[in-house]
């Protein structure tokens, strides 16, 4: 059990809290006794019981307070470390704005150019990794893992605790780096990057060790073997693993796999998107500094980035087909997944695939507080400019609430249009940031036009936005598109942008039918006052994750996360995610030291009498699996006879 360390201030605060609670309780008891003397006199036993219960409750509160560690155990006490902030992460940074914000630069064909999507400011150029670079990374990681794989949990927890404290104390810097490279707002970064990452670290510290303990399994059912044979699964590191992560959460998507890899005793080579190389370099350096501060090998974590494959450069495919990887987690799009799976198959590397989604937000007739729901819908659709794999892609509303909810949302977006821009330097108040690039603007506009041509109504937005302050920024108008039907392209394809799509359903079953009509199956939400009906919908949705009367809460650390159908397969997160990065070694052993397996004489080579050997095995099987006590006794006599 972990030791608890309380400083003097905490002890004084604890004492004063308990004393105040106790004094309040005494005051209430005295008031009762003064106001009802006769009742007290006639119910001394009741008062005694009440006093005892209150005392037990007070003791329980005290124990709960003390048993909640204020600091980590000394075995993994966090280590402080620092990291210089990059120049572009400084507040009010005056970076040069580029005419072209493409990652390609004809003058430097082997380099990746990085820009701030919100402003167009140039962040720097980085050489695309070569096949030789990849080999070196895998080799270094493998060498570091050979020692790290045998580390005890206190060393691993020390690294995570140190990382936890750094993130908690440097939120502004981390958010600014993430925003500068992705174009999102500081608020979106705080919730989508920092909060969820700290939760993952803290959950792993608190529950991860228990998940990786050997798992004893019941059995065998064989009557003879069950008395002296035990079986368990021991979870061992795989070695060097890889994670190929998307750009929409440059901090969280990068750190999530690293946290899981380090805790399970693995080394990891992370391949970030070419869109967020600048921030990924800083974040991986943060991890390596943390490892160094904890006296661990920083080579445990490596960062790779490559330009998309061409005839002259196939490094990206070389990475995913590398035989040094024992496991790959991919977060990205469906088209890219096909290439990754094809490459990974060359070395038989297992892959967890987390792809896009077309998550439905279902509002049933029993849902009442539509104003509150409109706030959830707005946040779930427009956060990070809609670039969220579990963002709301379709709002499916049963007929009783449809028109009212459409009006509420349209009125909100008309009266208070979402302000677009950049708040990285806190120069203005904004609601929605930029998109990562303008590469998909033609596609988004075409989806809207197709829907309108087929009968949908465009109430807000629908096209790209030329920002007056940031003409090089990548902005798309917050869009409200209603009366969408399944035959429209926007109902079947992932938008991954700030387009609020609304679909009208006839009834609850029609809500489910519409939700399941898309080829994806990542997540979904259902809202209503009838819990039985909500559970019916949740059980009927063909998805990997569902939230009831909430949005995206299935992305909590204790649950495995992943989709089905066109959204991929496999899970990361939760206990299952940790176990998936381990070799589940099945071990069978003797539980009684004086009993061991021997080959019976009738079965020993060479077989001296086939008939006797057959009868021996037959009697053994009967004795092992019969439900009749008499049959088992007879088999024992037969075994004794045939064994001679």
Curated annotation (Swiss-Prot):
PTM details? Answer: N-glycosylated.
Recorded family membership: Belongs to the aldehyde dehydrogenase family.
Question: Could you identify this protein by its name?
Answer: Putative aldehyde dehydrogenase-like protein YHR039C
Q: Which InterPro entries match?
A: Ald_DH/histidinol_DH, Ald_DH_C, Ald_DH_CS_CYS, Ald_DH_CS_GLU, Ald_DH_N, Aldehyde_DH_dom
What EC designation does it have?
A: 1.2.1.-
> What are the alphabetically sorted keywords of the record?
Endoplasmic reticulum, Glycoprotein, Oxidoreductase
Q: Tell me the GO molecular function terms.
A: aldehyde dehydrogenase (NAD+) activity
Source organism of this protein record: Saccharomyces cerevisiae (strain ATCC 204508 / S288c)
Give the main location: endoplasmic reticulum
Q: Where is this site: Transition state stabilizer?
A: 248
- Its GO CC terms? endoplasmic reticulum
Q: Where is the active site?
A: 354 (proton acceptor), 389 (nucleophile)
Identify the Pfam families for this entry: Aldedh
Q: Where is carbohydrate linked to this protein?
A: 15, 565, 627
Q: Name one GO biological process term.
A: reciprocal meiotic recombination
**Where found?**
Endoplasmic reticulum
Q: Output the PANTHER family linked to this UniProt entry.
A: ALDEHYDE DEHYDROGENASE-RELATED (PTHR11699)
What does the further note read?
A: Present with 2500 molecules/cell in log phase SD medium.
């Amino acid at each position: 059990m972990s030791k608890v360390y309380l400083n003097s201030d905490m002890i004084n605060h604890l004492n004063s809290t308990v004393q105040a609670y106790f004094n309040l309780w005494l005051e209430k008891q005295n008031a009762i006794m003064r106001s009802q003397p006769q009742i007290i006199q006639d119910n001394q036993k009741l008062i005694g019981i009440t006093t005892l219960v209150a005392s037990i409750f007070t003791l329980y509160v005290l124990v709960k307070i003390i048993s909640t560690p204020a600091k980590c155990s000394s075995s993994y006490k966090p280590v402080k470390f620092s990291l210089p902030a990059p120049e572009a992460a400084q507040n009010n940074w005056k970076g040069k704005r580029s005419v072209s914000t493409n990652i390609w630069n004809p003058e430097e064909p082997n380099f990746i150019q990085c820009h701030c999507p919100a402003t167009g400011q140039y962040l720097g150029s980085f050489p695309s990794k070569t096949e030789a670079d990849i080999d070196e990374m895998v080799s270094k990681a493998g060498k570091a893992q050979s020692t790290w794989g045998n580390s005890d949990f206190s060393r691993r927890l020390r690294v995570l605790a140190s990382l936890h404290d750094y993130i908690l104390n440097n939120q502004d810097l981390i958010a600014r780096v993430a925003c500068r490279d992705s174009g999102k707002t500081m608020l979106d970064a705080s919730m989508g990057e920092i909060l969820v990452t700290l939760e993952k670290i803290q959950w792993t510290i608190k529950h991860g060790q228990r998940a990786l303990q050997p798992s004893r399994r019941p059995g065998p059912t064989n009557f003879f073997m069950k008395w002296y044979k035990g079986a368990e699964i021991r979870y061992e590191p795989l070695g060097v693993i890889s994670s190929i992560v998307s750009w929409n959460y440059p901090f969280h998507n990068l750190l999530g796999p690293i946290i899981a890899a380090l805790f399970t005793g693995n080394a990891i080579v992370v391949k970030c998107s070419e869109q967020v190389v600048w921030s990924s370099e800083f974040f991986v350096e943060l991890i390596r500094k943390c490892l160094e501060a904890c006296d661990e090998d920083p080579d445990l974590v490596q960062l790779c980035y490559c330009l998309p494959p061409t005839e002259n450069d196939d490094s990206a495919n070389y990475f995913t087909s590398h035989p040094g990887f024992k496991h790959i987690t991919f977060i990205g799009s469906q088209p890219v997944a096909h290439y990754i799976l094809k490459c990974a198959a060359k070395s038989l590397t297992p892959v967890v695939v987390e792809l896009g989604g077309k998550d439905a937000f279902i509002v049933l007739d029993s849902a009442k507080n539509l104003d509150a729901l409109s706030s959830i819908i707005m946040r779930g659709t427009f956060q990070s400019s809609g670039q969220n794999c579990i963002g709301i892609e379709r709002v499916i509303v049963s007929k009783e609430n449809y028109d009212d909810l459409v009006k509420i949302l349209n009125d909100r977006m008309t009266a208070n249009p979402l302000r677009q821009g950049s708040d990285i330097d806190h120069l203005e108040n904004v609601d929605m940031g930029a998109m990562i690039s303008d590469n998909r603007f033609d596609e988004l506009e075409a989806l809207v036009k197709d829907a309108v041509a087929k009968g949908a109504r465009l109430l807000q937005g629908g096209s790209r936005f030329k920002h007056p302050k940031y003409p090089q920024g990548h902005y798309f108008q917050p869009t409200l598109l209603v009366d969408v039907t399944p035959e429209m392209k926007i109902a079947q394809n992932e938008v991954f942008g700030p387009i609020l799509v609304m679909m009208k359903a006839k009834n609850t079953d029609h809500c489910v039918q519409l939700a399941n009509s898309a080829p994806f199956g990542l997540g979904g939400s259902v809202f209503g006052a009838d819990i039985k009906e909500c559970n019916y919908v949740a059980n009927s949705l063909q998805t990997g994750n569902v939230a009831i009367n909430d949005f995206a809460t299935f992305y909590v650390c204790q649950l495995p996360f992943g989709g089905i159908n066109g959204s991929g397969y496999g899970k990361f997160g939760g206990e299952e995610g940790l176990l998936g990065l381990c070799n589940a070694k099945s071990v069978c052993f003797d539980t009684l030291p004086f009993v061991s397996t021997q080959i019976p004489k009738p079965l020993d080579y060479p077989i001296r009498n086939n008939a006797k050997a057959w009868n021996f095995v037959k009697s053994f099987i009967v004795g092992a699996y019969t439900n009749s006590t008499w049959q088992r006794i007879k088999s024992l006599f037969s075994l004794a006879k045939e064994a001679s």
